[in-house]
């Protein structure tokens, strides 16, 4: 018989795996859709990443919504807020209309995210400060973080 402690460990590991797999699935389904800000101004970028609260923003296909009357495109926003990883989906062209919001992980410490086209040349922000317009995704997204004093390093890609 499993003890409560063992059940909690299995449950936490399962949540962690599901969160990372969901992030990877979102990246695989990402499309080059130019983003607009909350005032509907063109940002001339298809992907925005930073080490601020809002770590990832891009548009992806929504495979769970099969209704033909609605667009299957969703803006995906990942936030690092109050030591948690939060996934928010909105309409692709209107960030003000939230479709769903879910806390995927809690108790995350020291989250750092890096972006780049080579693992030897990663940056804290994407696109870089000197890029005005970018219609591409970074080749790599690297997340370094700790949960319950265990260090994790995830290397992900948009496969573009």
Predicted stretch roles:
Residues 68, 88, 97, 123, ...:
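Short acidic, gly/pro-rich beta-turn/loop elements at beta-sheet edges
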Residues 71-73, 99, 138-140:
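Short beta-strand-initiation
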Residues 109-160:
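Short linear sequence signals and composition-biased patches located at protein termini or domain-edge surfaces
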Residues 74-76, 100-102, 150-156:
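Short beta-strand segments
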Residues 2-94:
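Extracytoplasmic beta-strand-rich oligomerization domains located immediately C-terminal to a leader/signal peptide
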Residues 69, 95-104:
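A short, polar/proline- and glycine-enriched secondary-structure boundary/capping micro-motif
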Residues 28, 33, 102-117:
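Structured surface patches comprising rigid loops and adjacent beta-strands/short helices at the edges
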């Amino acid at each position: 018989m499993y003890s409560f402690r063992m059940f909690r460990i299995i449950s936490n590991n399962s949540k962690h795996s599901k969160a990372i797999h969901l992030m990877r699935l979102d990246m695989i389904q990402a499309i080059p859709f130019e983003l607009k800000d909350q005032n509907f101004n063109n940002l001339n970028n298809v992907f925005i990443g930073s080490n601020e609260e809002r770590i990832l923003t891009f548009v992806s296909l929504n495979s769970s919504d099969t209704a033909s009357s609605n667009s299957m495109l969703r803006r995906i926003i990942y936030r690092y807020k109050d030591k948690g990883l939060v996934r928010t989906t909105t309409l692709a062209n209107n960030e003000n209309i939230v479709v769903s919001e879910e806390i995927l992980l809690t108790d995350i410490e020291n989250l750092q995210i890096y972006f780049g086209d080579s693992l030897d040349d990663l940056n804290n922000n994407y696109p870089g400060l000197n890029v005005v317009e970018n219609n591409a995704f970074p080749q790599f997204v690297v997340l370094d973080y700790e949960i319950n004093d265990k260090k994790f390093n995830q290397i992900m890609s948009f496969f573009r």
